[in-house]
Amino acid sequence: MSQEFEVGHSAVPNAATTTVEKPIASPTTTTIQPPWTKRHLNLILIGDVNSGKTAFLDLLANVCAGVPLEDFKPVHKAANERDSSQPGSNTNVPEFYTISCANGTEVNILDTPGLGDPRGIEIDFQNRNAIVKAIQRHFETVNAIIILANGSLYHTMGVEFVIKTISHIFPHSIANNIAFVLTMVDDPTMIVFDRSYLPDELKDAKVWGINNPFSLWMKYQKKIAENPRTLPEDFLEEMNDSIHRDYPKTLTTLSEVFQFLDKCEVQPMESAYSLKERPDIEAPVPNVIAGMN
């Protein structure tokens, strides 16, 4: 099985482009069923710091391209990632990816730095303006915005700040094109997500929970490559079995996500403008009111 990755820098500062080609088909390839019908999908992944946006991008890129779980590999540009042990967003600048899918369609995804960066409001302000510039460069229309959040944490402040930022960038009509994906969710019935603080326009937004199999598989590969190994063999076997056992559930969830995306009416992006014109966007504070008007 072969994959080809082509990386190029955008002419716009703080934006980059990566193309992910679909692999040669394999009899063991598992894809999203039923397939979606739109030939092109434009998505924006956005969320607070450490919400798992880039890992979710890697999952989408592998699954959409028809790559079997055992062959999962990172597709994100490693040079665009900071040391995860350091505070702040791991993603340096917005990165644009084009994924050639196994069903012949194309998915364009903008991966973005985390909002609410603890390194300070200046970093956060730069990141938000870079997101706007990347949107203006790459998208005339957008199918959906996926807001990611750590589903293992009970928090509202970070997500509220993300929603407030979105409300200042996009037209009011984008509300019907917004959905949530909660990461690090072992059991979908135990999702920690409070809708009460959401603006009325998002009270009925779609919410899905996943425990990203791409992240789990990368951790498993790292553990079995250790010499000497730090985990007992039976633990590693259980880890492998668990990932494979839960993977079909993830495919079911992704199928629901793409059926939602397929039904979204495209939204024009000509009204997205620089946040420099909106100085009223502040750092995240308690009780942020994120009206979509």
Which residues does each predicted region cover?
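Long, non-membrane, amphipathic alpha-helices that form coiled-coils
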Residues: C264-N293
